Amino acid sequence: MSAAKLNVKTSSKPNSRIAVEVEVPANRCKNSYDEALSKLSRSISIPGFRKGKVPKTVVIQQLGVKRIQASALESLLQKVWTETLDQEGIEPLCEPELEDGFETILENFNPEKTLILKLETDITPIPTLKKSSGLTAEVENLIFDPKKVDELIEQSRAQLATKVPVTDRAAQKGDIALVSFKGSFSDDGSEIEGGSADSIEIELEQGRMIPGFIEGVIGMNINDEKILKCEFPKDYHQEEAKGRKAEFNVSLEDLKIKELPELNDEFAKQASDKENMSDLRADLEKRLKEDNDRKQAKTRQDSLLDVLVKELEVDIPKSLIDQEVRIIVEQTAQNFAQQGIDVKSMFTPELVKSLMESSKGEAEKKLRQKFALKALAKSEKIEVSDKEINSKLEQVEADIKLSNEKNIDAKRLKEAITDDLLQEKLFAWLEENNTVVEKPPEKARDQIKEKSSKKKTTKTNKEKKSSKTPKS
């Protein structure tokens, strides 16, 4: 026999919260109390009584009425809240908050009387758009720079460079130095955690170490020893080192210089699967242009999404923002871990707190973008068919088989494909129903302004000269 329908009142609150008032009949309260007492009498162990056979009066004497009532109330709250959600069709985003707090309710709880529960919870917001078509977005036109081909080739040259020993001069910028060092803080002489190393290679380029270190090694000769005075940046990742001055006892053990390979067909074969420099350059140019086109498309999408978000009306609950913040911080930690950084030592409670605070703006922006697209899909009835999903799924699964990838979550893969296909349709709709104005890059705009300014100056000078010319 199912429980009688609960008497429930609901009212909307700001930021997608809902207030719920539930009237719990006295008989439900009494039943919950009796169940709690029976459960405790079966589990409690009291000398002189067999387990499970302790009289209820003895249980009450041993545990006290309040403890039994607390157990009864806790169980009652869980059951009543679950029933309320099901009865009212509420989909909460977080655990409910009791208006008066558990302790206050317990203090006034009488199993013989009706209980009035007042709770609040966050619910999924319903986003709406004031407007979704006829909007104008501005986007900077990305112009392909052929110099990037040369930059990539130079990077490959550096990677394929051979290290040649240097013995007849002091260390210079760009050299590779083999050094040993031991660091300590200047203020108290304490050893710096991770501030010592034996015989490691360091490229003498700015930004490789903390300020003052590279500059100090430059000018040293092999077998020289030197004390370098440095200072940790104020935003350094180790909390105890931030902004502190330090001394490093450094010895230069060896010195080498990079010898770059010649730019010929042999280099092209080493650096790629191409047979000659001409083919290598053509391939790099093609890849860079494709990358430029992808970035341009992404920039267009971002600008369209920005103007759409301005038309969004939605109240985002705090619990959703907090959840998104946690995701951002976790992704940040994963990125550092993939770079080989010890996340446990780096992510101190202070840093995590700071990251969570600074990520709130980004979290809210991401959520507003999601809700804007969700509202667009609903208002324009844009959806993805099963046929489209299955067709794309077959393509992706074929690619996965070719790459020998394992441990693929089929459900998540299908969800990701569905999301991607829906986004493609949404942005295609935005492109078709709105205007994107392409403007020249900032550099080009500055050059145009400069030319325009020069023309005006030249014209003014000519006019001045003309006015000074005597009449005939």
From Swiss-Prot:
Its main location: cytoplasm. It catalyses: [protein]-peptidylproline (omega=180) = [protein]-peptidylproline (omega=0). GO terms for cellular component: cytoplasm. It is found in: Cytoplasm. Residues 433-472 are annotated as: Disordered. GO terms for biological process: 'de novo' cotranslational protein folding; cell division; chaperone-mediated protein folding; protein transport; protein unfolding. GO terms for molecular function: peptidyl-prolyl cis-trans isomerase activity; protein folding chaperone; ribosome binding. PANTHER family: TRIGGER FACTOR CHAPERONE AND PEPTIDYL-PROLYL CIS/TRANS ISOMERASE, TRIGGER FACTOR-LIKE PROTEIN TIG, CHLOROPLASTIC. It comes from the Bacteria. Residues 174-261 form the PPIase FKBP-type domain. It holds the Pfam family FKBP_C. Its EC number is 5.2.1.8. Keywords: Cell cycle, Cell division, Chaperone, Cytoplasm, Isomerase, Rotamase. Involved in protein export. Acts as a chaperone by maintaining the newly synthesized protein in an open conformation. Functions as a peptidyl-prolyl cis-trans isomerase. NCBIfam families: tig. Residues 439-451 have a biased composition (Basic and acidic residues). Consists of 3 domains; the N-terminus binds the ribosome, the middle domain has PPIase activity, while the C-terminus has intrinsic chaperone activity on its own. This is Trigger factor. It comes from Prochlorococcus marinus (strain NATL1A). Belongs to the FKBP-type PPIase family. Tig subfamily.
